[in-house]
Amino acid sequence: MITAVCILLFLGADLIRPPSVVPTDRGGVVVSAKGGDRRWTANWTMEQLERDGKKAIRFTERGQGHVSPYSEEVKWSLESVWSAENGLRPLESEKVVTTKTGKPLVTERKHFDLNNNTVRFERQFSDGRSETKSLSIPPDTLAVEGIAGILRFLGFDQNARLAAHVLSNEPRLYSVTFETRGMERVKTPAGQFEAYKVEMVPHMGVLSVFRSLFPKAYFWFTVAPPHFWVRYEGPENGPGTPDIVMELDRASE
């Protein structure tokens, strides 16, 4: 799966405040290279659920096409669960990738321990190889799985910035801020929308002078509530991967 940014709820770190009721939503996306060539399509869902008696959000995605780092067309299914108690924080995710004909290629899992601020990353290949890595993470860490659905809850009421860390699938942790860049009218396969443009700005410490060398990433969310995601421009799977344009193909069904 997916207004100026609101003043955030401070809970020891900047966290996005969940709504009292999470809307059930679903739709489709179409992804093209910057040159216009079609790369892949996907269907996604978002719903509220309970996890261990606490409020959570589940995102799913099923896609097919050409996506980095695979040289051939693949299929995948993804499920990601986020805590929605006090602030929105990732709990776990699983992504299963197969060939176009259904032959298993790789399974990726992330499990977040919110009490100890750690994440365990696992990658298992069909030939028996596996990779495991554990990282310490700040409380404001966001996972890429479901991030567009989470950012729609920024609020978009007042000028502000969201400072956070983003965990990629490398896996690597990036310090970023999400900054509003005004409003634009955006045309997508799902229609035309008045949308807020949000830039994801990387922070590189003493290397910030080289920020211009990093690929830019932008998200667009509708001005009209519930501020659903309509467009993304940026790297497909982190630095070094193809720049893409991802658009809403059809709105909620």
Describe each region flagged by the PLM:
Residues 3-17:
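Bacterial Sec-dependent signal peptides at the C-terminal "C-region" and cleavage site
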Residues 13-116, 158-253:
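Acidic, serine/threonine-rich low-complexity disordered tracts
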Residues 8, 121, 134, 171-173:
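Generic secretory/membrane-interface signal
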Residues 4, 115-119, 129, 142:
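Intrinsic disorder/low-complexity detector
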Residues 124-158:
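Surface-exposed beta-loop interaction hotspot
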Residues 121-123, 249:
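Terminal leader/tail segments of proteins
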